[in-house]
């Protein structure tokens, strides 16, 4: 109790008060009430809203503050850094730990975990780190190595910070330890300056990243690149950061007060939370959410940070609405001022919809909305969703969630042909059907992968995690698709060669190609194994490259794989299809075309080919039919 007048005067007085309580009146709700250092109770809904990057209520929760909130601790998700690197630091294995990554990757949060296992922790007055000791070794932390400190310029700050390591080859010999979060570019710029006496460390870092971690680091040094962390990568317990964070933010102990709320059965926030923390079906719903997020990871358009992840989950749970806002929305529905279908947009399964009020400007949510599952048609299923009553037997069974939306959906599903509907009812009808589709994706009992916008996603996932035999088959498949994109559809030649058109000019009479032996190429998953021993990593792309000239390589993302998969099945892309995001394919082709060549293949109809070859010794040109023996 924080107020002196409310405290018991003595232990005896407290005991007498306790004895007056009937033990049958005691109730263990499992609810945790969290108060801040002023004694004020913290609202979980307000806290969740503060995590959303575009919150109208303030987004203070998106950044690690100088003082950690109780709910920050309660919802903190342990990562591999906490589980593996933390113990290695505690055991004295590393004296210098450098952490790079984007803003929001959790660098500061981890450094604070290190400080949490240390002794004699003293925060620096500049609020950019602390001094402490681990096993008697003095340490200093720096939360942001790119900023100036008080009257000192950044170069001066870094010079002093790295001073214990000047001239060392074995960093374990340093008398003091350091842990720093810093932008990789800024770090290398500083270290490469000869006057800073750290050019050797700059070379080590550069070689380490260039050789994808296969260059050995000096003893006592660890470099972590959080840009390689994936929020959908699974650990040994089959949990991802996404799954762990959802479970933390929807933990039942944090949401106990919702059970006695008068609007509990109609509140979309409670429905969302109860769905995701359900003991029976919650994990399955989260798995389907993981596949949706995995499409973003595999597209490689955005590195999803912990801040992005928490912002996304927050928006999915509350849509930036407070408890008072929910009451007002339900009153608007009751007063016919807001259509029920529009209120449905607030449920978690409509996270890929952009029809709620103003579209979100959060960068991850925008990508999710561009990948809307409601835009994928499955006629046989859609027909039943639109024209039949939805049956409980066709959906997941929830253990503790009390509310089902199916009766509400059935009641609102007015079946009229399009010609009988005005613009308003037609708009609501479309919104209703899209809600049915998205709800069915997350809670329906069926092959949900068919609803994902990328039909090759499952196959791509399998290739990324396949064996060497699978990779060899995939290499031939990709090479054939690239050949097809150049007009080389002949499977006999493409079985062993990659074909590239020798000219961009359309010839109405014939085609000409350069061929490259597939044995000169290799295909591998972008694993970065040596760089990710302390972080969650999931292979997100394939690397198709020349064995000798490794700079000639093509990074195959999900978008490109989907396009090549379509091409292999007969789709003939236009020039516009291959422009823009597929510019890397054109760069790869250009690099191959730049190699010296002495042969061209020509054909009138892509069936009968002729070889036109230059003899380098005699300088004579030989023309001969291409037969199967020369393939």
Identify what each model region corresponds to:
Residues 94-110:
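Walker A/P-loop nucleotide-binding motif
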Residues 208-262:
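Conserved small helical "lid"/interfacial subdomain of P-loop NTPases
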Residues 56-86:
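N-terminal pre-Walker A segment at the start of P-loop NTPase domains
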Residues 1-27:
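C-terminal lobe helix-coil module of Hanks-type protein kinase domains
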Residues 26-36:
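Regulatory extensions appended to serine/threonine kinase catalytic cores
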Residues 133-179:
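Conserved nucleotide-sensing/catalytic segment adjacent to the nucleotide-binding pocket
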Residues 404-631:
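Long C-terminal appendages of very large multidomain proteins
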Residues 246-507:
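Extended alpha-helical coiled-coil/bundle linker/stalk regions that scaffold oligomerization
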